[in-house]
C-alpha cells in the first residue's frame, strides 16, 4: 500500500515537473534572446553567441518606427482606468446580488452566467459599429469602455466571497443606523481584501494583454496602439529579422508588471479564488 502511494506521488511529481519545464522553456528562451546581439529569428542554437543590453536600450530609444514608450504608457493608462471602473462595477454588482433580494434577481444572475460563457470577440463587429456611430473608434477611451463595459458579467466569484461574510454583521449595522452604502464601503469591503485584490488583478490583466479588441478598434492609428499591437508589428515579415530580439526585450518588459503583481499579491489572489468558490 505504501509502495503504491509512493509510486503514485512520484508519477504526479514527474508530471508536474514535466509541465513546469514545458512552461518555463519558452520563458527562458524569451529572456535569454532578449540579450542576444545577433539579429534574426530563425536560429539553430539556444544560447546566444554574444550578449548585449542594447535591445532594451533600442526598445526605448529607437522610436521612429516603433514608439514603444508611448505604447507602454497607452497600455498603462487604459489598464489602470479599466481596472478602476471594472473593479467598482464587479464589487458593487456582486454585493447587490449577494445581499439584496429583488424581482428578477435569479433571472439576471442566470443571464449573466450564460452571457459570460460566450467569448467577447463574438460581439466584436457590433461593438465596433457602435463605437464608430458615436465617433469613438481609434481612441483610448473606446478601449476603456469596451474593457470595463462587460466586466460586471464576471460577478460570480466576488458574489461567492460576499456570501461567506455573515449577515449578522449587516443586521448589527442596520440596528446602529447604517445604510446599505455605509455597510458596503465601511464593513464589507474592509473584510473582503482577498476578493478585492483578485478582482483588481483580473481587471488589470485583461486590457494589459488584449490584442483582438485593440486591433479592431485602433486599426492603423499607431499613436494610440497598445503594447500588444506594437510588439506584433515588430515580428511582421518585413521587420522580424531586425527587430526579433527587440521584440523579446519588449515582451519581457511587458511581463514585469504582471509578474510583480502576482508575486506580491499571490496570497490574496489564492484566498480570493478559494473564498469565492462557494455555491451562492
PLM features per residue range, with description:
Residues 1-280:
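A hydrophobic, multi-pass inner-membrane permease signature
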Amino acid at each position: 500500500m505504501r509502495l503504491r502511494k509512493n509510486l503514485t506521488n512520484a508519477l504526479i511529481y514527474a508530471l508536474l515537473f514535466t509541465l513546469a519545464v514545458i512552461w518555463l522553456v519558452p520563458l527562458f528562451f524569451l529572456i535569454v534572446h532578449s540579450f542576444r546581439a545577433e539579429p534574426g529569428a530563425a536560429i539553430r542554437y539556444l544560447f546566444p553567441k554574444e550578449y548585449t543590453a542594447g535591445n532594451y536600450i533600442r526598445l526605448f530609444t529607437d522610436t521612429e518606427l516603433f514608439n514603444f514608450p508611448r505604447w507602454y504608457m497607452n497600455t498603462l493608462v487604459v489598464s489602470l482606468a479599466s481596472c478602476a471602473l471594472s473593479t467598482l462595477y464587479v464589487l458593487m454588482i456582486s454585493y447587490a446580488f449577494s445581499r439584496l433580494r429583488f424581482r428578477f434577481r435569479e433571472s439576471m444572475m442566470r443571464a449573466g452566467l450564460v452571457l459570460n460563457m460566450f467569448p467577447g470577440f463574438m460581439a466584436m463587429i457590433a461593438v465596433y459599429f457602435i463605437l464608430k456611430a458615436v465617433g469613438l473608434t481609434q481612441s483610448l477611451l473606446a478601449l476603456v469602455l469596451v474593457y470595463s463595459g462587460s466586466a460586471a458579467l464576471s460577478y460570480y466569484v466576488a458574489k461567492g466571497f460576499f456570501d461567506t461574510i455573515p449577515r449578522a454583521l449587516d443586521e448589527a449595522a442596520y440596528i446602529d443606523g447604517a445604510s446599505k452604502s455605509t455597510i458596503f464601503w465601511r464593513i464589507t469591503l474592509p473584510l473582503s481584501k482577498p476578493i478585492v485584490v483578485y478582482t483588481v488583478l483580473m481587471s488589470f490583466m485583461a486590457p494589459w494583454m488584449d490584442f483582438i479588441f485593440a486591433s479592431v478598434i485602433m486599426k492603423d492609428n499607431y499613436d494610440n496602439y497598445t503594447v500588444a499591437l506594437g510588439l506584433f508589428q515588430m515580428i511582421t515579415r518585413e521587420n522580424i529579422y531586425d527587430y526579433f530580439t527587440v521584440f523579446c526585450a519588449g515582451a519581457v518588459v511587458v511581463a514585469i508588471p504582471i509578474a510583480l503583481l502576482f508575486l506580491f499579491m499571490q496570497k490574496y489572489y489564492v484566498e480570493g479564488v478559494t473564498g469565492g468558490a462557494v455555491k451562492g
